[in-house]
Amino acid sequence: SKLADMADWNIYSPKWAPVSLDGKWLKLEDKDPYDYARVERVIPATKELTVEFDVMAGQDSHGELDIEFVDDKGNACSRIVLDSLGVMKVKGGPRYGTLVKKYKAGETYHVKAVLSADMHAGTYYVNGKKAAQRQFDTPVEAITRVVFRTGPLFAEPNNETPADQSFDMPRADESDPLAVFSIANVKTTPSDADGQAAVLKFDDYKPYVDYFNGMEDENIKNAIPNSKAAEWMSRNVPLFDCPQENFKEMYYYRWWTLRKHIKRTPVGYGMTEFLVQRSYADRYNLIACAIGHHVMETRWLRDSTYLSQILNTWYHGNNGKAMQKMEKFSSWNPAAVYEAYKVNGSRNFLMTLKPSLEEEYARWQNTHRLDNGLYWQEDVRDGMEESASGGRKKKFARPTINSYMYGNAMALAEMNRLSGDNAKAEGYSKEAAGLKKLIEEKLWNKKHEFFETLKNDTAADVREAIGFIPWYFNIPDAKTYDAAWKQVTDEKGFAAPYGLTTCERRSPLFRTHGTGTCEWDGAVWPFATSQTLTAMGNYINNYPTPILGSKEFFHDMEVYVESQHHRGRPYIGEYLDETNGAWLMGDRERSRYYNHSTFNDLMITGICGLRPQADGSIIVNPLVPEGKWDWFCLDNVSYHGHNLTIIYDKTGNHYRHGKGLVLLVDGKKVAQRDTLGKLEYKF
């Protein structure tokens, strides 16, 4: 390697104080009485930092090496000095503490500094032994650089130095005895809660949490109360930044609301749908309807314990068996679990759940299969009662359950391939292929160019948002069925001022079932919005010539953001009026913080464009229209054992990590393009 390859270092190397590489050592030489060699390791701003390095002096009777830990303004909170008398010491306040009484020329010393900006103190070790503990010389907010410099900063010239002088500086053409210092194995380890973030810091977004905590009462507390929300979020959620305030606020609001539903049970964590008790809930007030959404959203938490235990509670929390009321609602759980695997990369996570997921799949096969090969479901068991096409006791072939079962079969096929059971994998693949054929042949209404519910042998003859769900699982062939997507931009279809409706607005059945009984005949449901936008993201990313793009996706996400407000505050509830945005259960306690949809999964996979892959490769394709935002960043994303950062910076001047779309892996730049678009990286 060469100095030019050291992208994370600032290097100052004048002629009489050069910097060079000598094998593993970074060598700083100095014979200049008026200058010095300097190298700086640039790091993300960090409050709790451990710095380790090896240092070797070429002499012990002259020369000086200063090692400083500085903030973004150049203030040094702490300084380690190898002085000209052979003493290694650390400055704290006006005095120095000794680290090594007499260091020896040519001997290697391993130095470790454990620094806390919050405590204004550092603990220092040499060769594995504690040598000193000192208060910081200067308080700093955070540390951003580690500086190695051959001598102190010069105090002159300064503002008081005369502009015109009639004499030469003393020894201007003379050199000092050559001093050589070498450093190697420099390692910085942040221990901030968000210490793996490369660009953003949680503290910059904590004011959102403070506002959410104070904007209304906290009458129900689960595992993580409001008082612990900021600490929990700093440790668990990816960080997001953009120039559009409402997007940013909603991103952190939805994480803040999600943790309200994490509940301790006797068998581990569970995740609720309602905070209030519901009579029809399973043990621990759990409801199975939105498990798929819970998995898709929770898969992005940095601590995978939450998702693992939530799923374990569902599948083994009933005396070792699945929860009793799990089959009360349709399930795309196996498919969602496989999508979570695409993020965490944990084969053990998948294999632990596989037997239970296969048992669940078999139960649906045994109870909900029609003679024609499709699956039936009552609309209320889809979580979609009072719908335009179904009924609470109508056993119709709906796009929901059939798409779910296809997705589940495909996921189980992949799980069995991973476990080496290719025969079983092939069986699931054939099951999925058969369902795909039936969905395309029997649920596609050619007249309406839409996937619709099949009532016995007759199409329901009404377009509903559930007709987009086949794309949630990438079922339809390309081009043949694309016309369905025209309906999301058609105001007679699903486009409304406050979101995508659950039934087409032109239908005579639209909003005919009354109000206040959870109707799915047209009002906007975030449950459905999440499914439709996930499907749209798949359609735009995975199909060759989509008739929609980032413009339409961003518009619908923007409306989704705007709709999540009630009485001037961020809000997520059950469902809302499509024309005026009024939450139809908005003042009922049951509706507040309703955990029945995704949002941040759409922000991560859609807006920021991170498309998870089972093999751990990285595809980034942000669905932000050109010219909409000049910058945005998604940081501290845990992905297959790595930390990802996605940056878009039109000019390169906002985040200063380069111009255009940039991908960092573990803080290192691995891919870049000048404009928004697809970026790919394989390890």
Report the location of each language-model feature.
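Extracellular glycan-recognition surfaces and repeat-rich motifs
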Residues: K2-W25
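Secretory/extracellular carbohydrate-interaction modules
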Residues: D22-M88
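Short, aromatic/His-centered strand-loop micro-motif at the edge of beta-sheets
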Residues: V90-K112
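Flexible glycan-contacting loops in extracellular carbohydrate-active proteins
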Residues: R134-F181
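Acidic/polar, glycine-enriched structural segments that form the non-catalytic walls/loops
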Residues: S191-D282, R347-F349, E358-R363, E414-L418, ...
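Aromatic-rich carbohydrate-recognition surfaces in CAZymes
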Residues: F202-Y208, N226, Y284-D379, G383, ...
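Extended glycan-interaction surfaces of carbohydrate-active proteins
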Residues: E245-R283, W300-M323, N366-A397, K437-V524, ...
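Non-catalytic carbohydrate-binding regions of carbohydrate-active enzymes
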Residues: S419-T453, A483-H642
